[in-house]
From Swiss-Prot:
This is Superoxide dismutase [Cu-Zn] 2. Disulfide bonds join 56-145. It comes from Oryza sativa subsp. japonica. Destroys radicals which are normally produced within the cells and which are toxic to biological systems. Cu cation binds at residues 45, 47, 62, 119.
Length: 152
């Protein structure tokens, strides 16, 4: 079993810890929680770069090693890093529990060293008709991020 973790932080008081685990070539399990969010849906993605020198802005675009358009997690045509939305309750806490086969922790398309990003707004899953729908899901600003690091 391979395990990884990302500690999310921001200047806006949003914080959290996201855990990743993968057994063999199976899907990667993503669990954890994020607090300090406004209630509602927030885009949740793996971004290409593990660079936070300019905060979450320097994490680059969504992780997309196969050059596809943005989509929903269940879509065949999607960025590998498109994990859809997380939902924050009235207390501002979003619990994460996702399983995904396009974000491996080993191999050529490993997400180790990349970043997980929480967005200000809902991800329209590429179906919103906005000019940004097919690239970012029109999910708005980046309110928290963390670099995905290998765990022992």
């Amino acid at each position: 079993m391979v395990k990884a973790v990302a500690v999310l932080a921001s200047s806006e008081g949003v914080k959290g810890t996201i855990f990743f685990s993968q057994e063999g070539d199976g899907p990667t399990s993503v669990t954890g929680s994020v607090s300090g969010l406004k209630p509602g849906l927030h885009g949740f993605h793996v971004h290409a770069l593990g660079d936070t020198t300019n905060g979450c802005m320097s994490t680059g675009p969504h992780f997309n090693p196969t050059g596809k358009e943005h989509g929903a997690p269940q879509d065949e045509n999607r960025h590998a890093g498109d994990l859809g939305n997380i939902t924050a309750g009235a207390d501002g806490v979003a619990n994460v529990n996702v399983s995904d086969s396009q974000i491996p922790l080993t191999g050529a398309h490993s997400i180790i060293g990349r970043a997980v990003v929480v967005h200000a707004d809902p991800d329209d899953l590429g179906k919103g008709g906005h000019e940004l729908s097919k690239t970012t899901g029109n999910a708005g600003g980046r309110v928290a991020c963390g670099i995905i690091g290998l765990q022992g």
